């Protein structure tokens, strides 16, 4: 265990839900996966933990961990998804704060609780190389040989007409086709809209015969528990034949995240998905959101979606790769428990695919 540097202190599980959301919105790197609702729905209230790091009494970093323990032995894992949060809004981010918060996380969950700590920070390969050094110096190693997934980040600080001009020619043509259709946009955050979207999403999943990467019903429950200012944005596109496309986006911090998209069988010719994405960008611009994360690309396994997102991002879209997951542990029992649990989960997943 290493003490935090002078002037820094940490607190664990000393914050209530309402206060957590107030703190969450103070960080530019805040996101859906660090919301109280996400952790509670995914793991249950008893299995989430909240850590604060303070400098001279002022909160400068926070992290929500999801705790999973093996029965009886008490060993297990603490997982920080898309965290910790340490980049303040409207102020320069300090890498030293990142050091202090991952040290505090390690002190609590590795040293005090004997868990395997795994973090998935919002850091990219093209970020300063100092972060890899900090992670190593604070006792973290990359989780196996795993490297992070790729995504495309759009900079929304440019004028709207410049963003439109940056769209690749194919995307511009499809958007013009959609704008000539008699399409109606329905938007909001109500549960009724989520239900309509799920019906369309399930139809698309069945048509394309692919396995859902995320449990859409789980996200609906999360939406019901999120406070108004943190709820996901739902946008639906209706043609004369009915609902033709939809999307769900999360805006908690300075980066909007594209979570789900769907197109109905009858709506495939309307190009509604192009119109929705552009209307979403207009809405994000009005809210002064700085960036739009198109949330995952894989040219090999999903070339169609990759092309759609690449063309939307345009020549100035930032194609980035996350640094990946990092972990730290001092307990052989926790390492063994997590390894067995993940192996069983992988086997169960393989059996479900058959």
Predicted region positions:
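Active-site/acyl-donor-binding loops of N-acyltransferases
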Residues: 1-9, 14, 67, 135-161, ...
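A conserved beta-strand-loop-helix scaffold within acyl/acetyltransferase catalytic domains
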Residues: 6-56, 60-74, 121-126, 131-149, ...
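Short amphipathic alpha-helical interaction patches enriched in hydrophobic/aromatic residues
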Residues: 88, 205-209, 296
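Aromatic (often tryptophan-rich) hydrophobic motifs at membrane interfaces
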Residues: 79, 96-107, 218-335
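Conserved beta-strand-loop-alpha-helix junction that forms the acyl-donor binding cleft
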Residues: 119-129, 294-303
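Glycine-rich, N-terminal phosphate-binding loop and its surrounding beta-alpha-beta segment
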Residues: 59, 63, 75-123, 127
């Amino acid at each position: 265990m290493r003490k935090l540097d002078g002037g820094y202190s940490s607190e664990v599980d000393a914050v209530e839900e309402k206060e957590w959301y107030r703190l969450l919105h103070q960080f530019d790197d805040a996101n859906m996966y660090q919301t109280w609702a996400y952790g509670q729905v995914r793991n249950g209230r008893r299995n989430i933990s909240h850590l604060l790091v303070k400098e001279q009494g002022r909160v400068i970093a926070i992290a929500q961990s999801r705790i999973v323990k093996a029965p009886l032995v008490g060993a297990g894992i603490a997982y920080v998804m898309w965290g910790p949060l340490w980049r303040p809004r409207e102020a320069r981010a300090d890498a030293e704060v990142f050091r202090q918060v991952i040290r505090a996380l390690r002190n609590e969950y590795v040293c005090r609780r004997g868990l395997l700590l795994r973090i998935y920070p919002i850091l990219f390969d093209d970020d300063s190389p100092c972060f890899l050094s900090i992670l190593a110096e604070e006792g973290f190693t990359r989780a196996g040989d795993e490297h992070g997934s790729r995504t495309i980040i759009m900079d929304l600080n440019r004028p709207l007409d410049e963003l439109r001009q940056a769209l690749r020619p194919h995307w511009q043509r499809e958007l013009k086709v959609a704008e000539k259709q008699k399409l109606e946009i329905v938007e909001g955050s109500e549960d009724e809209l989520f239900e309509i979207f799920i019906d369309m999403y399930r139809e698309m999943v069945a048509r394309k015969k692919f396995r859902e990467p995320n449990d859409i019903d789980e996200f609906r429950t999360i939406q019901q528990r999120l406070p108004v200012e943190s709820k996901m944005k739902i946008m639906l596109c209706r043609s004369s034949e009915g609902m033709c496309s939809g999307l769900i986006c999360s805006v908690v911090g300075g980066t909007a995240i594209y979570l789900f998209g769907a197109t109905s069988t009858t709506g495939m010719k309307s190009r509604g998905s192009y119109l929705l994405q552009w209307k979403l960008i207009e809405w994000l611009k009005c809210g002064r959101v700085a960036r739009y994360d198109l949330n995952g690309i894989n040219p090999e396994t999903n070339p169609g979606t990759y092309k759609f997102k690449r063309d939307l991002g345009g020549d100035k879209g930032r194609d980035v790769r996350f640094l990946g997951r990092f972990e730290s542990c001092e307990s052989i029992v926790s390492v063994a428990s997590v390894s067995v649990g993940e192996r069983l989960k992988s086997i169960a997943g393989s059996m479900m695919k058959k």
